[in-house]
Amino acid sequence: MLWDALLYAILGGMSFGTYPLFIRTPAVIQAKPHTIVFQLYKSSVVFLSGFLFLIPRYINWSNDTNNKDVPLFVFNWWAILSAAFWIPAGLFTIFSVPIIGMGLQVSLAASSSSILTFLAFWLIFGTEMKSYSCGTDCKYYLAPLYLFCTVLGMVTLIFSEKLTARIRKHVCDNNIDRKNNTKRNTEYKRYLTPIIEDEETETGSSADESSPMVAIPPVAKRQLFENNPETSTNGFGRWTAGVFLSLVGGIFASGQFAAVQQGKKIEQINANCLPKNVTCPATLIESFDTFGSWYVSFGIGAMAVTVLLLVGLSCSLGRCPNFHWNVLKSAGTKAGIFWVLGNFFVTLAVVRGGNAVIMAQVLSTMIITSGCWGLIYYKEGDQSSLRKFLWIIAAVFTLLSMIMLGFQKIDK
């Protein structure tokens, strides 16, 4: 178990789980900026921050005469590919968060990305997992079990509100049944007893009125149905699109970080320096340096792809879109900063611990962080103590599962 990789994964997941917070602020929702416009602010922060990383490196590089043979910057095409995966993932997130909510969007994207990443890198790319003996020519793996537990915890976090509602409904139904049985027993005793108890009759008839399961008037039912995006005719298609794009966004996020690990592995094989970097050429080492050339190349790719999309949007509209500077100069910049922090730590974690296990840990932390913001900051969904209790239990279960999953990867 690489504890430094786990720490990077948790820090990255917390940052990634926080950046959607600024997508659904009241000002942003009211302004309704185009997803590409919001992405432009994020890409600009990523582009500029990459060059900020080079400033302290340039100072050390210029003062150290022994490092003149080591280049300050080496362009990396794998970073461009990673950025090409990142842009769609970001666009799908920006589109779906205001529709289905921050907690559900992150949970859906994390679940799809976690399953795809683990299966692809274990079964296709050959990431080794610990096996356990069960006899002669018999072995089994615990990694799929812990992956299943991680996904189960994710699903529980997603549907914690609905589960709470079902539990509360079951308890209320039982209370109503007990009150109805008490009422029937009282009426049966009155039938056998010649004494008329008017007071008891009045008490029995009002039992249902004090029940927490009070009947909703038909008009109110219709209004609730029409205002719910999951059930209304107008909102169901948009809600479904938000759910679908959240799942697809998780798949693109997996490709973003897959380009880091697989690209580095391919280049090391071509340079005959796998698995240790000490014998690799200086240009190869620098091109995949998270603090330097890799991030600068990623920022260049992100900005280039975003500008191309913006040009296409302008051509389709016949004019430049509204950039909403007064609103997005704060929200877009903050979202970009938290994404930069998340990408920085997650890239470190992937390079240190591999993609198969690290991404499951990152995505689990993202779900817990976004869920906390949804419960505490935005007050999303049911705020009852029962729902919070179920959510905490599911969060702890998910954390333990992802830690145990980390122990299953063979460290090399």
List where the protein language model places each region.
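Polytopic alpha-helical membrane proteins, predominantly small-molecule transporters/carriers
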Residues: 1-412
